[in-house]
Amino acid sequence: MKQEHLALYLISFSLLFLFGCANQNTETKGTPLPFYNSADFTPEWINEEDEQYSQIHTIANFSFQNQSGDVINNESLAGKIYVADFFFTICPSICPKMTSNLEKVQTEFANDESVMLVSHTVMPWVDSVGVLKAYADMHGIENSKWHLLTGNTEKIYQLARQSYFAEKEIGLDK
Protein backbone atom coordinates (compact mmCIF):
# COMPACT_ATOMS: atom_id res chain seq x y z
CA MET A 1 0.00 0.00 0.00
CA LYS A 2 2.81 2.38 0.95
CA GLN A 3 4.63 1.78 -2.35
CA GLU A 4 1.42 2.35 -4.29
CA HIS A 5 1.05 5.74 -2.60
CA LEU A 6 4.68 6.56 -3.32
CA ALA A 7 4.19 5.56 -6.94
CA LEU A 8 1.13 7.78 -7.21
CA TYR A 9 2.98 10.67 -5.58
CA LEU A 10 5.87 10.25 -7.99
CA ILE A 11 3.50 10.20 -10.92
CA SER A 12 1.68 13.24 -9.58
CA PHE A 13 4.93 15.09 -9.49
CA SER A 14 6.18 13.91 -12.87
CA LEU A 15 8.02 16.71 -14.45
CA LEU A 16 8.96 17.90 -17.84
CA PHE A 17 12.60 18.85 -17.99
CA LEU A 18 14.14 20.48 -20.94
CA PHE A 19 17.82 20.64 -21.57
CA GLY A 20 19.16 23.21 -24.02
CA CYS A 21 20.95 22.14 -27.13
CA ALA A 22 24.40 23.40 -27.93
CA ASN A 23 23.50 24.27 -31.54
CA GLN A 24 21.02 27.11 -31.22
CA ASN A 25 20.25 29.39 -34.12
CA THR A 26 20.53 32.95 -32.78
CA GLU A 27 18.32 34.31 -35.56
CA THR A 28 15.30 32.39 -34.32
CA LYS A 29 16.05 32.66 -30.63
CA GLY A 30 12.81 33.17 -28.73
CA THR A 31 12.04 33.75 -25.09
CA PRO A 32 14.58 31.87 -22.97
CA LEU A 33 13.29 29.06 -20.79
CA PRO A 34 13.72 29.33 -17.03
CA PHE A 35 15.80 27.03 -14.86
CA TYR A 36 14.30 25.32 -11.83
CA ASN A 37 16.97 24.96 -9.18
CA SER A 38 14.85 24.07 -6.16
CA ALA A 39 11.92 21.87 -5.18
CA ASP A 40 9.58 24.85 -4.89
CA PHE A 41 9.87 25.33 -8.67
CA THR A 42 10.58 29.02 -8.59
CA PRO A 43 11.63 29.87 -12.14
CA GLU A 44 15.00 31.54 -12.60
CA TRP A 45 16.19 33.10 -15.82
CA ILE A 46 19.96 32.75 -15.84
CA ASN A 47 22.24 33.83 -18.67
CA GLU A 48 25.30 31.79 -19.59
CA GLU A 49 27.44 34.75 -18.55
CA ASP A 50 25.99 34.82 -15.01
CA GLU A 51 28.02 33.30 -12.20
CA GLN A 52 24.94 31.26 -11.21
CA TYR A 53 25.00 29.43 -14.56
CA SER A 54 27.75 27.11 -13.36
CA GLN A 55 25.54 26.11 -10.41
CA ILE A 56 22.28 25.27 -12.19
CA HIS A 57 20.44 22.12 -11.17
CA THR A 58 21.17 19.08 -13.30
CA ILE A 59 19.88 15.53 -13.37
CA ALA A 60 22.16 13.13 -11.47
CA ASN A 61 23.97 10.35 -13.29
CA PHE A 62 21.75 7.35 -13.94
CA SER A 63 21.88 4.08 -15.81
CA PHE A 64 18.78 1.97 -16.51
CA GLN A 65 17.56 -0.50 -19.13
CA ASN A 66 15.02 0.45 -21.76
CA GLN A 67 12.31 -1.62 -23.43
CA SER A 68 14.87 -3.08 -25.85
CA GLY A 69 17.24 -4.11 -23.07
CA ASP A 70 19.70 -1.35 -23.98
CA VAL A 71 21.45 0.60 -21.22
CA ILE A 72 20.37 4.24 -21.24
CA ASN A 73 22.26 6.79 -19.17
CA ASN A 74 23.13 10.48 -19.09
CA GLU A 75 25.60 10.03 -21.92
CA SER A 76 22.87 8.51 -24.10
CA LEU A 77 20.91 11.75 -23.77
CA ALA A 78 23.81 14.23 -23.84
CA GLY A 79 23.03 17.31 -25.91
CA LYS A 80 19.38 16.32 -26.26
CA ILE A 81 16.22 17.99 -25.07
CA TYR A 82 14.23 15.38 -23.24
CA VAL A 83 10.85 15.14 -21.62
CA ALA A 84 10.88 12.87 -18.57
CA ASP A 85 8.05 11.34 -16.60
CA PHE A 86 7.38 8.59 -14.06
CA PHE A 87 4.74 5.93 -14.65
CA PHE A 88 3.94 2.24 -14.33
CA THR A 89 2.38 -0.02 -16.91
CA ILE A 90 -0.54 -1.24 -14.78
CA CYS A 91 -1.51 2.24 -13.61
CA PRO A 92 -5.24 2.73 -14.19
CA SER A 93 -5.50 6.47 -13.58
CA ILE A 94 -3.14 9.22 -14.73
CA CYS A 95 -0.53 7.10 -16.54
CA PRO A 96 -2.68 6.37 -19.61
CA LYS A 97 -3.35 10.10 -19.94
CA MET A 98 0.34 10.93 -19.62
CA THR A 99 1.24 8.25 -22.15
CA SER A 100 -1.38 9.59 -24.56
CA ASN A 101 0.04 13.10 -24.25
CA LEU A 102 3.59 11.85 -24.72
CA GLU A 103 2.46 9.95 -27.83
CA LYS A 104 1.46 13.34 -29.24
CA VAL A 105 4.89 14.75 -28.35
CA GLN A 106 6.52 11.75 -30.05
CA THR A 107 4.47 12.37 -33.19
CA GLU A 108 5.14 16.11 -33.21
CA PHE A 109 8.91 15.66 -32.87
CA ALA A 110 9.26 12.42 -34.85
CA ASN A 111 11.80 13.94 -37.23
CA ASP A 112 13.67 16.03 -34.66
CA GLU A 113 16.64 14.01 -33.41
CA SER A 114 17.36 16.56 -30.69
CA VAL A 115 14.13 15.76 -28.80
CA MET A 116 13.73 12.55 -26.76
CA LEU A 117 11.22 11.11 -24.30
CA VAL A 118 12.16 9.18 -21.16
CA SER A 119 9.61 7.40 -18.96
CA HIS A 120 10.89 5.87 -15.72
CA THR A 121 8.81 3.10 -14.17
CA VAL A 122 8.09 3.45 -10.46
CA MET A 123 7.27 -0.27 -10.26
CA PRO A 124 10.36 -1.96 -11.67
CA TRP A 125 9.49 -5.21 -9.88
CA VAL A 126 6.48 -5.37 -12.24
CA ASP A 127 7.80 -3.50 -15.27
CA SER A 128 10.55 -5.74 -16.60
CA VAL A 129 12.20 -5.14 -19.97
CA GLY A 130 9.71 -7.56 -21.56
CA VAL A 131 6.70 -5.84 -19.98
CA LEU A 132 8.00 -2.45 -21.12
CA LYS A 133 8.53 -3.83 -24.65
CA ALA A 134 4.91 -5.05 -24.78
CA TYR A 135 3.72 -1.66 -23.47
CA ALA A 136 5.84 0.14 -26.09
CA ASP A 137 4.42 -2.03 -28.87
CA MET A 138 0.86 -1.46 -27.66
CA HIS A 139 1.35 2.33 -27.69
CA GLY A 140 3.36 2.68 -30.90
CA ILE A 141 6.43 3.88 -29.04
CA GLU A 142 9.47 4.40 -31.27
CA ASN A 143 12.48 2.85 -29.52
CA SER A 144 14.85 5.43 -30.99
CA LYS A 145 12.72 8.34 -29.74
CA TRP A 146 11.20 7.19 -26.43
CA HIS A 147 12.90 5.16 -23.72
CA LEU A 148 10.81 3.31 -21.14
CA LEU A 149 13.28 2.73 -18.31
CA THR A 150 13.47 0.12 -15.57
CA GLY A 151 16.10 -0.72 -13.01
CA ASN A 152 16.87 -0.72 -9.32
CA THR A 153 13.90 0.57 -7.31
CA GLU A 154 15.96 2.60 -4.86
CA LYS A 155 17.99 4.24 -7.64
CA ILE A 156 14.83 5.19 -9.55
CA TYR A 157 13.21 6.65 -6.43
CA GLN A 158 16.41 8.48 -5.47
CA LEU A 159 16.60 9.98 -8.96
CA ALA A 160 12.95 11.03 -8.74
CA ARG A 161 13.37 12.68 -5.36
CA GLN A 162 16.79 14.28 -5.73
CA SER A 163 16.92 15.16 -9.41
CA TYR A 164 13.26 15.65 -10.30
CA PHE A 165 12.18 16.97 -6.87
CA ALA A 166 9.44 14.35 -6.37
CA GLU A 167 8.53 14.10 -2.70
CA LYS A 168 7.50 11.18 -0.51
CA GLU A 169 4.67 13.24 0.87
CA ILE A 170 2.35 15.53 -1.04
CA GLY A 171 3.61 19.08 -0.87
CA LEU A 172 6.82 20.50 0.46
CA ASP A 173 7.96 20.99 3.99
CA LYS A 174 8.51 24.71 4.45
Regions found by a protein language model. Name each.
Residues 66-67:
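Short, acidic, Ser/Thr-enriched surface-loop or helix-capping motifs
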Residues 73-102, 118:
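Short active-site neighborhood of thiol/selenol oxidoreductases, capturing the structured segment around
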Residues 99-159:
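Structural microenvironment flanking redox-active thiols in thiol-disulfide oxidoreductases
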Residues 54-56, 75, 90, 94-97, ...:
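Extracytoplasmic/periplasmic, Sec-exported soluble proteins
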Residues 153-174:
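Thiol/disulfide oxidoreductase modules built on the thioredoxin-like
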